[in-house]
């Protein structure tokens, strides 16, 4: 069993694994050579004072390293299975698609904007010339609004659903493992486009579908239930519809 310890360090000390391992050994009264592994459980910054401090919560393992708990991501083929339409390819839409695949359903994602590579071109035009494509910009397109504007991970749902699995999924697709224990995890806009592409590829490899440049204009309602959506003159039907439209697509509800 590990021993748990919390250290208050300077930013430089918190970045030095050798230093905090040695300090943990002294605090626990054990020879440093008896420590098999020191694992960071949580790291947070206290900037209330003039000199910022880092609160480092550690698990200290003596004698032998623990076996890591296996994390399995089983995305079976859903080609030809019951289809569910997802409107929006931001975080909600992408994670909904992955969960549907786990449940044996085929997600079809409709995105009003363009894929993440094309979005880079459109955003460059905004910064260079002020030309804004209303459907492909900082707010719309593959990955959602945060892909090119920030990269911080924020949720109000830590008490609902498997928050850690969501982080593990991002690590599986290329995010750094530090997001698993940072108090304010941050992937970064330099890494997010590649991660979004990998998630899309996972969905496609499992038989899911993506349709870009497809703005939803209306809902198809039959018998009091939503049975699909209209993209202009094109009807896309499904057993259910997930509206994962984010905060900017207010027009779909008007």
Regions found by a protein language model. Give the residues of each.
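Residues forming the flavin
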Residues: 2-54, 58-148, 152-169, 173, ...
């Amino acid at each position: 069993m590990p021993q748990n310890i919390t250290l208050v360090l300077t930013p430089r000390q918190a970045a030095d694994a050798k230093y905090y391992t040695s300090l943990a050994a002294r605090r626990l009264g054990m020879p440093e050579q008896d420590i098999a592994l020191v694992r960071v459980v949580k790291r947070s910054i206290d900037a209330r004072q003039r000199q910022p401090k880092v609160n480092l919560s550690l698990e200290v393992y003596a004698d032998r390293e623990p076996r890591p708990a296996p994390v399995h991501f089983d995305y079976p083929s859903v080609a030809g299975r019951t289809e569910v339409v997802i409107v929006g390819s931001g975080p909600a839409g992408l994670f909904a698609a992955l969960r549907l695949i786990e449940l044996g359903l085929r997600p079809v994602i409709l995105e009003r904007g363009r894929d993440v590579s094309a979005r880079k071109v459109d955003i460059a035009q905004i910064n260079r010339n002020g030309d804004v494509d209303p459907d492909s910009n900082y707010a719309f397109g593959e990955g959602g609004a945060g892909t090119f504007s920030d990269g911080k991970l924020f949720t109000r749902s830590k008490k609902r659903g498997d928050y850690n699995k969501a982080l593990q999924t991002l690590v599986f697709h290329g995010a750094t493992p530090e997001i698993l224990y940072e108090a304010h995890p941050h992937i970064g806009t330099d890494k997010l486009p590649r991660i979004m592409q990998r998630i899309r590829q996972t969905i496609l490899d499992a038989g899911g579908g993506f349709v870009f440049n497809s703005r939803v204009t209306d809902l198809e309602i039959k018998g009091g239930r939503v049975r699909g959506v209209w993209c202009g003159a094109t009807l896309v039907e499904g057993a259910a519809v997930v509206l994962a439209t984010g905060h900017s697509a207010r027009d779909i509800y008007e």
